[in-house]
Amino acid sequence: MDAMQEAPWVVTFDPKDTLEEKLKKAAHVKPSPAQLNWMEKEFIGFVHYSPNTFNHVQWGNGTEKKSDYHPAKLDVPQWCRVCSRAGMKMMIFTAKHHDGFCQWNTKTTDFSSETILGGEDVMESLQKGCEDNEMGLGVYLSPWDMHQRGKGLWPKPEYNQYFLAQLRELLTNYGRVDEVWFDG
């Protein structure tokens, strides 16, 4: 039996186990320290902000015009202050949703907030706001990128490199990232 199977947060069932035996095993599961730490966060903010905030649609399709994204006064640290005062211990930010619009200064595409906001890095502002408010930072990064599909990069291996480059940027340029969400 390997170490993972012996861990107190793992239950291993034998195919011959009865329901009663399975219930008895499951009743003795203990969460790992990392799992306990995550559960103690209890209240986490999930911020979904993108060009579609201004289009009144839930999802974009990757063909949005840069002119669709027009925040009059973007105050990302204010988001963090409000969430912190509400008792949230972490914020998860949609750095890129399915439309492919990147909310950080990326080298992978010009379909980003950087090209529209004159170099302002929304992700950097969020990271600083979370740090200033003693909150954890989570990143939502959609592997499904409808904007790149339109450019012919969809099922090709090049897309994997493109996506991994984005993930690398987010995990190395913004300090500690406590959680990563993939969706798509």
Region roles according to the model:
Residues M1-G184:
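Mature catalytic domains of secreted/periplasmic carbohydrate-active enzymes
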